[in-house]
């Protein structure tokens, strides 16, 4: 098991959207647990999940991303959002990041609804979109990772490697049918959406290229090939 704890990229301005999203998800989880205690847990499943008890509704492609099945589900998603969201928010700006997160959640929900057609809940699709954008913007940024494999150790891994492993696991789990209750289609749709959006933003010049993004690394590799 690999758990991201942080990155070596400095944050140039305080994050606002990322902690706000975390607070909203935590608040929604508290309300969920309270509703469960009153015997009204079916309210959330029927009205706010993708393909809940009342079928599909467009607004649920937003609301599902603020709800979680249990504490570990919430904690894992919020940890990934904290680690990867703050650098992406710093790069895209608050409005741009909020738009990426919400649109990424919608894209992930639609992908799940199209191919899975079963109930879905959780921020992981939106967080995957943020992570996919991170891969384009900061592919060589090092991720501080807690590694559980017989022994517990701390390691630094490049973003392309860590995120690549996450994507590969989702693909393999989906193909092999071992994903269980994990909505791998939503994850993969989120990764693809975030990657494409960040790629287009850089390619079009809507955000400035920097020496460490995917485009700059590609140019550096091309120049090295030319000098060989």
Model-derived regions, located:
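A detector for small-residue-rich transmembrane helices and their helix-helix packing motifs
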Residues: 1-228
């Amino acid at each position: 098991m690999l758990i991201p704890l942080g990155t070596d990229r400095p944050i140039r301005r305080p994050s606002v959207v990322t902690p706000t999203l975390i607070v909203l998800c935590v608040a929604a989880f508290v309300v969920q647990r309270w509703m469960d205690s009153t015997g009204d847990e079916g309210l959330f499943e029927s009205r706010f999940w993708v393909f809940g008890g009342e079928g599909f509704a467009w607004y649920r492609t937003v609301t599902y991303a603020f709800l979680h099945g249990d504490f570990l589900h919430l904690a894992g998603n919020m940890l990934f959002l904290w680690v990867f969201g703050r650098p992406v928010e710093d790069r895209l700006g608050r409005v741009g990041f909020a738009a990426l997160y919400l649109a990424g959640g919608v894209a992930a929900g639609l992908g799940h609804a199209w191919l899975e057609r079963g109930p879905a809940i959780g921020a992981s699709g939106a967080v995957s979109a943020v992570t996919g954008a991170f891969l384009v913007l900061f592919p060589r940024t090092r991720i501080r990772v807690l590694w559980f494999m017989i022994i517990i150790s701390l390691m630094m891994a490049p973003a392309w490697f860590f995120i690549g492993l996450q994507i590969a696991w989702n693909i393999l789990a989906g193909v092999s049918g071992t994903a269980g209750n994990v909505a791998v289609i939503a994850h993969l749709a989120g990764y693809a959406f975030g990657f494409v959006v960040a790629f287009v933003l850089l390619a079009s010049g809507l955000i400035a290229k920097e020496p460490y993004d995917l485009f700059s690394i590609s140019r550096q590799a091309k120049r090295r090939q030319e000098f060989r």
